[in-house]
Amino acid sequence: MRTIISLLLLSAMVFAVIEAISLEEGLQLFEGERGCVGENQQCADWAGPHCCSGYYCTCRYFPKCICRKDSGK
């Protein structure tokens, strides 16, 4: 009986650790996107603000750099 209870507690602890790690990774991804700007917004790749996922920073007329939609090339 003690063995079964010990295994259940061990399983619960392993599950809690795995869940905490995946939650932390998700929060880090969200924090990385928080300060981003969208299409046709002013950006600066070297210092920020950075473009959101799916966009890239292009500087045709420095210092007027803007985010453009990434075509996936």
Curated annotation (Swiss-Prot):
Primary location class: secreted
Expression tissues: Expressed by the venom gland.
Intrachain S-S bonds: C36-C52, C43-C57, C51-C67, C59-C65
Organism: Agelena orientalis
Domain notes per entry: The presence of a 'disulfide through disulfide knot' structurally defines this protein as a knottin.
Classification via InterPro entries: Beta/delta-agatoxin_fam
Residue span(s) of the pro-peptide: 21-34
Modified residue annotations for Serine amide: S71
Cellular component GO terms held in the UniProt record: extracellular region
Entry protein name: U3-agatoxin-Ao1c
Note: Negative results: does not affect mammalian sodium channels (Nav).
Compartments reported by the entry: Secreted
Record function comment: Insecticidal neurotoxin that modulates the insect Nav channel (DmNaV1/tipE (para/tipE)) in a unique manner, with both the activation and inactivation processes being affected. The voltage dependence of activation is shifted toward more hyperpolarized potentials (analogous to site 4 toxins) and a non-inactivating persistent sodium current is induced (site 3-like action). Interestingly, both effects take place in a voltage-dependent manner, producing a bell-shaped curve between -80 and 0 mV.
Protein family (similarity comment): Belongs to the neurotoxin 07 (Beta/delta-agtx) family. 03 (aga-4) subfamily. Aga sub-subfamily.
Signal peptide: 1-20
Assigned keywords, A-Z: Amidation, Disulfide bond, Ion channel impairing toxin, Knottin, Neurotoxin, Secreted, Signal, Toxin, Voltage-gated sodium channel impairing toxin
Keyword Endoplasmic reticulum: no
